[in-house]
Amino acid sequence: MADRKEQKRVNAEKRQENWVDRLVSVNRVSKVVKGGRRFSFNTVVVVGNEDGLVGTGLGKANEVSSAISKGADDAKKNVIRVPMRDGTIPHKVVGKQDAGKVLLKPASPGTGVIAGGGVRAVLECAGYRNVLTKSLGTSNPHNQVKATINALAETEDALEVARRRDIPLEKVFNG
């Protein structure tokens, strides 16, 4: 499985794409020091080109704006290519990250992206137009985003399945 994920990774620095970035969450954290509390921020950011490339990143800094830019830079380093068929995913898949599970199902044209929060951000940045989702488990946005990325990394196009099984493409659908 690790080989497939590495195979899908795309070197974002070589590609000069028009990235769309979405801020999923901003979290203020505090550290208690001798003089009181010291606040810092962490952000979860999703970037994509709305054409099959998507990545997620976590940024931490003392100011919100620098945490967002660090998160976007981190997301561009973790970009994967995801398969798409008629604006939806090729098949039903469940992604897991810690206590978070996300179920993704293909949808017919005109349905739209039925998702909430971080899951919607990932799917829209990837370029999906019709997907049904269900978040099972945690409501933590960071784990939801990572579970969605894991689910998308597990999806396979029909051509990949045909090549792997060494059968013609028609046999994939007709058995």
Swiss-Prot record:
Q: Name one GO molecular function term.
A: structural constituent of ribosome
Going by the UniProt record, its keywords in alphabetical order are: Ribonucleoprotein, Ribosomal protein, RNA-binding, rRNA-binding
Instruction: Give the top-rank taxon of the lineage listed in the UniProt record for this protein.
Output: Bacteria
Give a Gene Ontology cellular component term annotated to this protein: small ribosomal subunit
Q: Where is the S5 DRBM domain?
A: 19-82
Query: Is Repeat included in the keywords of this UniProt record?
Result: no
- GO BP, sorted A to Z: translation
| UniProt-listed Pfam families | Ribosomal_S5, Ribosomal_S5_C
Give disulfide pairs as residue numbers. Answer: none
Q: Which Gene3D superfamilies match?
A: 3.30.160.20, 3.30.230.10
InterPro entries according to UniProt: Ribosomal_Su5_D2-typ_SF (IPR020568), Ribosomal_uS5 (IPR000851), Ribosomal_uS5_bac-type (IPR005712), Ribosomal_uS5_C (IPR005324), Ribosomal_uS5_N (IPR013810), Ribosomal_uS5_N_CS (IPR018192), Ribsml_uS5_D2-typ_fold_subgr (IPR014721)
Protein purpose: With S4 and S12 plays an important role in translational accuracy. Located at the back of the 30S subunit body where it stabilizes the conformation of the head with respect to the body.
Annotated domain remarks: The N-terminal domain interacts with the head of the 30S subunit; the C-terminal domain interacts with the body and contacts protein S4. The interaction surface between S4 and S5 is involved in control of translational fidelity.
Subunit description? Part of the 30S ribosomal subunit. Contacts proteins S4 and S8.
Task: Name the family the entry cites.
Answer: Belongs to the universal ribosomal protein uS5 family.
Recorded protein name is Small ribosomal subunit protein uS5
Taxonomic lineage of this organism? Bacteria, Pseudomonadati, Rhodothermota, Rhodothermia, Rhodothermales
Name of the gene encoding the protein in the UniProt record: rpsE
